[in-house]
Design a protein with these regions (language model features):
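Catalytic-core helical/loop segments in enzymes performing group transfer/polymerization on anionic/lipid-linked
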Residues: 1-421
């Protein structure tokens, strides 16, 4: 939570500063945390032994059917012994329950909740007396701690006195409240890798200096990984102990097939990233300018499936630039394109086996370390906005596409790893 607060302060994200209760006596805090919201479902619901927290990321197959990007194979493997709790309103994806159906508990805090709240207050007191953080940093950190306890109390009340043994979810960061609830209830929590993990990742690869502190960190009991490459990345850090890094293989909805490389076109695939329209739109506009010298080349922009500012990208549309449908398959375009362009993205790894050359726009600020690490590993070729990428591509002496085998990135799906306690 301290890391969240410091990052928000660095980004100056004003909307992340909340009104908190930590300045009040703890007895008053306990009363305020009883301000509940009535649930729209009864309290006597039953969960299966396994629970999947569906984040709402969808994949569209060739027939236009929607599938859970991360949960489709998991649910098929666990079959009737798994309940789905949806975290997003996606009518296309079936679920047993939606998080919106559960209100906020109005019952008095029990002994475990009081203990957690007391621990948080001790942490807050230590932070304020330590003199290490600025007033604004403290405001962000207090907000992060408030959100943590809100999440903890909600999921603790949802999962308490149920028969749940294992909970599957994506992204441990910003979900520490869920992890804490599972720890208190002795529920095994298992993270599914949901995208790019980088050696410079702020949440996945911590330096040795943090080793002692990480012993008390709220981390999942296991993380399921796509393949051995990702395990080797986590091995650089010190938060994942032996036995917690499990190679589950390609549990994504998409099945990898041998691409038809005869379909290759003079096409540049731009894979955007969520919430980065302020960078991608001008970068793509500069790319379009360079293509005036290459009229036989075209651009297709594949937006992140969770992109909210879709309309902003429409200004790019013309005869040389297409915007792909939001939930279309990235692999359909990798089969056709010769060049992929982004900043830092999992799609660079998806390009393995597709005879695609990856280029990464060099930027400043958050994310620059990620991109430089990909360049150091030979996964991307760094370029600047405005560079003539087609000419650079045409001047390459050797194909850069086979940086890693598909098997190292996405191993064969192993259902047994998801069934073992």
């Amino acid at each position: 939570m301290f890391q969240h607060g410091v990052v928000y302060d660095y980004l100056n994200t004003k909307g992340k500063i909340l009104k908190t209760y930590f300045h009040l006596p703890i007895l008053i805090q306990r009363i305020l945390w009883r301000k509940g919201i009535k649930s729209s479902i009864t309290d006597n619901i039953s969960f299966k032994e396994n629970v999947w927290l569906e984040p709402g990321r969808m994949y569209t197959d060739e027939n236009g059917n929607y599938h859970s990007m991360y949960g489709a194979k998991l649910l098929q493997t666990l079959n009737e012994n798994c309940s789905t709790l949806s975290l997003n309103k996606n009518p296309e994806l079936e679920s047993d329950y939606s998080i919106d159906q559960f209100g906020f508990p109005s019952a008095p805090l029990d002994d475990i909740e009081i203990s957690v709240l007391s621990d948080l207050n001790r942490v807050v007191k230590s932070m304020k007396n330590g003199g290490f953080y600025s007033k604004q940093e403290q405001a962000y950190i207090l907000s992060a701690l408030h959100i943590f306890f809100h999440s903890f109390r909600k999921y603790y009340s949802i999962l308490k006195d149920k028969s749940v043994k294992r909970l599957f979810f994506v992204a441990h960061y910003h979900n520490e409240g869920i992890i804490a609830a599972c720890k208190k209830l002795k529920i095994e929590c298992i993270e599914l890798q949901h995208g790019l993990i980088n050696k410079k990742d702020l949440y996945y690869v911590y330096d040795a200096v943090f080793k002692n502190a990480l012993r008390n960190a709220l981390m999942p009991d296991k993380i399921m990984l796509y393949g051995p490459y990702w395990k080797s990345v986590l091995d650089y850090g010190f938060e994942w102990v032996d036995g917690t890094k499990v190679i589950g293989g390609n549990y994504l909805a998409h099945e990898f097939k041998s691409p038809n490389l005869s379909k290759k076109e003079n096409l540049i695939l731009v894979a955007s990233q969520k919430g980065m329209d302020d960078k991608f739109i001008p970068y793509i506009q500069s790319l379009k300018t360079t293509l005036k010298g290459h009229p036989d080349w075209k651009i297709i922009v594949k937006l992140h499936p969770l992109e909210k500012k879709i309309d902003r990208y429409q200004v790019l549309r013309d005869s040389q630039c297409e915007i792909a449908p939001l939930h279309s398959s990235i692999f359909h375009f990798l089969e056709r394109c010769k060049i992929q362009l982004s900043i830092y993205s999992t799609t660079f790894f998806d390009a393995a086996g597709y005879n695609v050359v990856n280029f990464s726009w060099v930027t400043n600020g958050i994310g620059s370390d990620y991109a430089s690490s990909l360049s150091e590993d030979g996964i991307v070729i760094p370029v600047r906005p405005g560079d003539d990428i087609v000419s650079i591509y045409q001047g390459l002496a050797v194909s850069q596409s086979e940086f890693l085998s598909v098997e190292k990135i996405y191993s064969k799906y192993d259902p047994q790893t998801f069934m073992q306690p």
